[in-house]
């Protein structure tokens, strides 16, 4: 969902280069220098307003997290939230998920998260889905060997497409859940804003974890 651009967003992003990067290409291969200490690097593509990535950074101080968001106002909202926390293991990027190879070196990322991505339901838009084969090829490059992807969605169509696309690509599934919130996997689940909304309506949340051979 597109959010109307707010005038305060750009000045806020510009005022906090220590936390949000506007030109991620300058740190390609050097992301560990942005953190207090060198640790495994996890990336969320499409962080939205930041609830998930901030929650993960709080729960896992032993991991360095990066959240990426293309919409500047949405990214600025996430930045506002992150500024309220003291998280030396969190960095944010205002950037495009299609440019990941320009942002990260091969094998620089240990794990990726795709949460409630745009399902692009029309068949002619299949190539825009973040689990289309061309995106998977990019993820395979920036991820370490056997690097994992975690995906959550409320959209069964996108979930089925992702399962098929990943299977056809030769990925291995470590877990598939058709009702996350009523499974043991939910015990340590960190929710997104969308996830809370959909779950409150009783909609099942689908999740998968897959890795490259």
From Swiss-Prot:
* Molecular-function annotations in GO: tRNA (guanine(46)-N7)-methyltransferase activity
Family from the record: Belongs to the class I-like SAM-binding methyltransferase superfamily. TrmB family.
Q: InterPro entries per the record?
A: SAM-dependent_MTases_sf, tRNA_(Gua-N-7)_MeTrfase_Trmb, tRNA_methyltr_TrmB_bact
**Protein name, entry field:** tRNA (guanine-N(7)-)-methyltransferase
* Chain sites annotated for binding S-adenosyl-L-methionine: 44, 69, 96, 118
Residues annotated as the enzyme's active site:
118
Keywords of the record, alphabetical order, are:
Methyltransferase, S-adenosyl-L-methionine, Transferase, tRNA processing
> HAMAP family from the xrefs?
tRNA_methyltr_TrmB
Query: Mind naming one GO cellular-component term on file for this protein?
Result: tRNA methyltransferase complex
The entry marks the following residues as binding substrate, namely 122, 154, 192-195
> This protein's superkingdom?
Bacteria
Role noted for this protein: Catalyzes the formation of N(7)-methylguanine at position 46 (m7G46) in tRNA.
Coiled-coil annotation: which residues? none
Report the EC number(s), separated by commas if there are several.
2.1.1.33
Catalyzed reactions: guanosine(46) in tRNA + S-adenosyl-L-methionine = N(7)-methylguanosine(46) in tRNA + S-adenosyl-L-homocysteine
State the pathway, as annotated in the record: tRNA modification; N(7)-methylguanine-tRNA biosynthesis
């Amino acid at each position: 969902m597109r959010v109307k651009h707010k005038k305060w967003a750009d000045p806020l992003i510009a005022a906090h280069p220590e936390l949000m990067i506007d030109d991620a290409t300058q740190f390609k291969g050097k992301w560990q220098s942005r953190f207090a200490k060198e640790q495994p690097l996890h990336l969320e593509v499409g962080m939205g307003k930041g609830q998930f990535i901030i929650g993960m950074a709080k729960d896992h101080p032993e991991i360095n997290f990066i959240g990426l968001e293309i919409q500047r106002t949405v990214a600025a909202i996430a930045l506002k939230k992150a500024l309220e926390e003291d998280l030396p293991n969190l960095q944010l990027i205002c950037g495009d998920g299609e440019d990941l190879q320009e942002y990260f070196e091969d094998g620089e990322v240990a794990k990726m998260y795709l949460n409630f991505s745009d399902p692009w339901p029309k068949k002619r838009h299949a190539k825009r889905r973040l689990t289309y084969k061309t995106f998977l090829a990019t993820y395979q490059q920036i991820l370490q060997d056997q690097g994992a992807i975690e995906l959550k969605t409320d959209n069964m169509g996108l979930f089925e497409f992702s399962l098929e696309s990943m299977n056809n690509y030769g990925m291995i599934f470590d877990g598939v859940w058709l009702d996350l919130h009523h499974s043991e996997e939910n015990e340590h689940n960190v929710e997104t804003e969308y996830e809370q909304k959909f779950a409150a309506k009783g909609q099942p949340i689908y999740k998968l974890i897959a890795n490259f051979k």
